[in-house]
């Protein structure tokens, strides 16, 4: 009903999405634009009142984003803070209308590139008014996917503790998580096999 009233052009796009998580992503951006507030995924435990996150946005900043502890230099779309009618979300909503990239051949890549973090970071890098976006410190969500069961959020700046969720993830999500958490091992293995190949070729 909200889409029909405020963004009717999004209705056919939402219907074409193959996965429910894509529709959930789009709706969160629309609601943040219309009403503002604090959005977070269900797989978080609140450690304290979240109102200070919204109150701490610097003057002139309408949107607050949280760094992804899984990807250096990127933000996550699982925790979003905004005042109502922040223009940034219109850029994000428009980006969800674009065609999927050619390389988005698995569910994880498709979701991330069309409505998820890849798309959000692409919009953020192209946004012409970066001074209107506040990036919170990593300590707001101090854990990553590799240490969920061991992480202890004890810092004074920690607001949220992620827990194991991943309700929409599929086999490729599990694979990418494993590769990320074992990147050092993979790098060592690649170097080892390259050296073996070079040694074999020189004989």
Residue positions per predicted region:
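Glycosyltransferase-associated regions of secretory-pathway enzymes
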Residues: 1-24, 40-203
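Small-residue hinge/turn detector
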Residues: 25-37
């Amino acid at each position: 009903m909200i889409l029909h009233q405020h963004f009717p052009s999004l209705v056919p796009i939402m219907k074409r999405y193959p996965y429910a998580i894509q529709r959930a992503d789009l709706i969160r951006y629309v609601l943040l634009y219309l009403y503002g507030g604090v959005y977070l995924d269900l797989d978080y435990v609140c450690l304290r009142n979240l109102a200070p996150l919204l109150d701490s946005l610097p003057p002139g900043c309408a949107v607050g984003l949280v760094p992804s502890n899984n990807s250096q230099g990127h933000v996550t779309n699982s925790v979003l803070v905004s005042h109502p009618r922040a223009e940034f979300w219109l850029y994000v909503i428009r980006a969800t209308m674009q065609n999927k990239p050619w390389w988005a051949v698995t569910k994880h890549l498709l979701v991330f590139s069309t409505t998820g973090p890849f798309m959000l970071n692409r919009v953020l890098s192209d946004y012409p008014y970066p001074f209107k976006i506040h990036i919170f410190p990593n300590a707001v969500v101090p854990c990553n996917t590799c240490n969920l069961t061991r992480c202890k959020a004890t810092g004074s700046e920690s607001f949220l503790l992620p827990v194991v969720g991943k309700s929409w993830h599929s086999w490729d999500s599990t694979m990418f998580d494993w590769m990320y958490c074992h990147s050092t091992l993979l790098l060592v293995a690649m170097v080892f096999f390259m050296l073996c190949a070079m040694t074999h070729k020189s004989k």
